[in-house]
C-alpha cells in the first residue's frame, strides 16, 4: 500500500 487512494489498484 502506497497511499489510501492508490491501494485500490496498487
From Swiss-Prot:
Give compartment(s).
Answer: Secreted
Cystine links in this protein are none
Q: What family classification does the UniProt entry report for this protein?
A: Belongs to the FARP (FMRFamide related peptide) family.
Write the protein's name: FMRFamide-like neuropeptide FLP5
In Gene Ontology terms, what is a biological process of this protein?
A: neuropeptide signaling pathway
Q: Which GO terms describe its cellular component?
A: extracellular region
Residues with PTM Phenylalanine amide: 10
Question: Keywords in UniProt for this one?
Answer: Amidation, Neuropeptide, Secreted
Amino acid at each position: 500500500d502506497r497511499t489510501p487512494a492508490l491501494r485500490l489498484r496498487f
